[in-house]
């Protein structure tokens, strides 16, 4: 068994009285985070014990935080600093702009009699909720709740709850199906599986929509007004949500349309942002900013839920190698025509399909001999 964690997003029903209590608590929590962030930035201290020793009394007295809230503020700030250090490798002070509140399970929030009980600065409030397919996660004999985040989005309140549960591990010996997945621009994905079946998800409409977003963003940037900057931010959020929804649908379909114990094989595209020189200028925005990583992560956790696995392999020559005779030559591929023609044996097919076929073959090689340290990167 291995553990898996997903985030359940649950809307809670808030009346005007409860809204005042929640807003006040979230605002004070946010202000306390900024206070602690200032101190951490000056001292470079990221230890919970020493921060608690110096700041706990101030958080309790000056911000009127309850004991657990004060501890949670410290953890929230420490986590934010560590994330910045991991991603940017430099010392920067994070600013907490939006009101927020991190709630510890069974201390700051609990679930009783079909209501969430949430702690505020002025006592607990009991709130009903809309499950929207999330009620299955409320069986605490199977699912364990973690520290939730309370957010206010366009006047609606949500609990983002990390839910952890056990899933059966997928062993190499159990694999019964292999799917090679080639990701790109003209086709979001092209697939090839153990039944010799190919599949395609066209990227034409998505490519056009992203180009429209890019054009609109450039037009707004030229105006350089506060209104245009707000619109640019709103467009960015809209585009990201749209992209994430597409990746959710694609990854869900991949898992749903394949049996348990499937091995999904992806190219390791970790260097995609540094590969713009190999992409047509008009396609660079689409290629470089396309959320390959988001699709990859969504597929990984959905595959685990279905007792399946994902591996990433070296992408070199996957578009130049003939899957029939193994001949590798750059001239095999006509990028403009999206056509692959082997100069050795004459085999012809769509170039994205060829990529998927070669990834499928590498998946088979992995199953035959999993000791391929220079080629295969397992998750």
Predicted stretch roles:
Residues 36, 72-85, 353-366:
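Stable alpha-helical structural segments in soluble proteins, enriched in small hydrophobic residues
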Residues 4-12, 123-132, 136, 199-201:
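Generic detection of short hydrophobic beta-strand segments and adjacent strand-loop junctions
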Residues 51-156, 289:
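Acidic carboxylate diad motif detector
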Residues 1-75, 92:
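Gly/serine-rich nucleotide phosphate-binding loop at the start of the catalytic core
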Residues 4-8, 16, 20, 154-379:
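Positively charged, helix-rich recognition surfaces that bind polyanionic ligands
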Residues 38-43, 50-51, 88-97, 226-233, ...:
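Short coil/turn segments at secondary-structure boundaries
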